[in-house]
Amino acid sequence: LNTWNPTEPFEPSEGCGFTITAIPIPHRSELSDNHALIIRGEERSLLFMPDQDSWSKTLVEDLDILEWLRSMDIDIAFIDGTFWDHSEISHRDVAEIPHPTVVDTLSRLGKKSDSAPEIHFTHLNHTNPLLDNGSLQSEELVSMGWEICKQGSIFYL
């Protein structure tokens, strides 16, 4: 049995060709802690971070999102896209369900440059207009160079 120590790379089975590292991410900790996973293959690395409270709590040393991803050598990132904006949840207190909105994330990211990692938005709430590929919101996100996770996609690391 292998023991997994958070923040240290873990190889699920010897010679499998990749490691997994858990990194703590601020998100409602009432029942347990929350971690993102970095999966490093032989050529590329992927960050899986479907849940977080806010970018201001997640980002360290005042880095912006892209600097933060580069500091961890991330090539592909799956990030929290729960809500497009707060109008989706006007009937609830946003403080009860903290997530950065896609609008906030896009304002921090700007348009994708050639050197930026791939970013895919995941963990979409059923109210999120990104679920409709033909929505204006989906078109805006894609026109900026970012992506929406699609079930069945394959990523080579």
Model-predicted segments: where are they?
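A generic structural motif
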Residues: L1-N2, M144
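Core dinuclear metal-dependent hydrolase active-site scaffold
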Residues: N2-W68, G152-L157
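Cap/insert and terminal regions of metallo-dependent hydrolase folds
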Residues: S45, D53-S153
